[in-house]
Swiss-Prot record:
Pfam assignment, any one: Memo
Protein's name in the database: MEMO1 family protein DKAM_1357
Organism, scientific name: Desulfurococcus amylolyticus (strain DSM 18924 / JCM 16383 / VKM B-2413 / 1221n)
InterPro entries: MEMO1_fam (IPR002737)
Similarity comment: family membership: Belongs to the MEMO1 family.
Amino acid sequence: MKKRSPIVAGYFYPDKPGELRSVIEWSFKHGIGPGKPPSPSDIPATNSIGYVAPHAGYIYSGPVAAHVYFDMALNKKPDTIVILGTNHTGLGRPVSVYPEGVWETPLGDLVVDSEIGRLIVENSEIAEFDEYAHLEEHSIEVQLPFIVYIYGEDVKITPIVIGIHTPDIARDLAKSIYEASMSTGKRIIVIASSDFNHYEPHEETSRKDSMAIDRILKLDTDGLYNVILHNDISICGPGGIMTLMEYTKKLGGKAQLLKYATSGDTSGDYSHVVGYAALKFYI
């Protein structure tokens, strides 16, 4: 079986299992995080269908990401997690679906759901099978250790890298994910992996991000696209976020902000920050 090895283990997060578990638990316990790791005694959450999660180094964005995985752990385990990454490298096709195989992490391996991937490609006008876009891309990989931490290896993934970020492509991809879910009856959670505004002072980044988050919470896909464009908001994964918004609308769902912070809140340097948001989509 084809294996995709980690490319940012040892950089964005530790490459040794014990150290990685410790950093994930630090993220849960951090003051910016939920305060503790999830446990069976916690009250079950609403029926989640997706999340927006950041993908920076864990020392910066881990506590915000932990809000996503704390909430996810309180929901019924999905059969498959569709992870929408963003194309930082320029490699591969415009919308690249990883076809089959295993993604390795220091905590365990996750099998690709080739059935869901095939149905997404068949039902989409733009999505294609392509491994090339995934080879050097970190935005999906950074989510996987958190997934293995809460679920072990007993969940499948469908990795998709998005290189063109428009509402029309988001609608096409959302439709294909929805049809794949309906035709298989599988419980799917969609994770849109994205950081928010980049490399401006904390106050300006927070101001810009609040405009984008307002559109996201209203599930206003065209509004999000326009506010990003007209206000120069450097969100790196808007295509995945818009896809999740459109998918949520197909299911009659809503959006909720779990946590917002910037890298300044974890690093102490507020002069040039990156914004991080944990958002939940549910029915």
